[in-house]
Amino acid sequence: VVSFSNIAYSDTFYGVGDSTTGTYADWMKTVYNRAGMPELLSIPLTTFDKDYNLVPMAAESWSQSDDGLTWTFKLRDGLVWSDGPALKASDYIFALTRAVTTGFDFGWYYSFAAGIKNWNAVSDGSKDVSELGIRAVDDLTIEVTTESVKPYLPGVFSLWFPVAEHAWKKHGDE
């Protein structure tokens, strides 16, 4: 057992990890070299508790359409990035639209496991990213359309981490 009780509180988190560029805004480039940092720096839509039950994280709730092809995720209000702006549905959309258009090496996960509509066609350039089956309905609502019924989709999204679009526009991979 490791105890951190003798370590003084700090507003700064220091951690050891590995990255493709030395920053962690690039985690959507390669999942295999991200060293678990997204889990420390951002929050997925869902997660699993110690008994492997699916539980909410950023999403306070989710529902599936009657035909099983559309999922709606409602984000918890009041979540913010460390620099102050609110976490928005568009930050999750930005993460996946960036992934699908940059050759993300874990793309099969969102294509096969998640079955996101048009993932492969957008990834290979035969369809525009605007046709990807994800959208921000409003600041707190994400809608996902799948190619086929995926009853386990909320569990798949335990690995969907947002990217702060406002920070990305300012800093990029740097």
Segments (PLM) and residue ranges:
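Extracytoplasmic
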Residues: 10-12, 40, 57-59, 66-70, ...
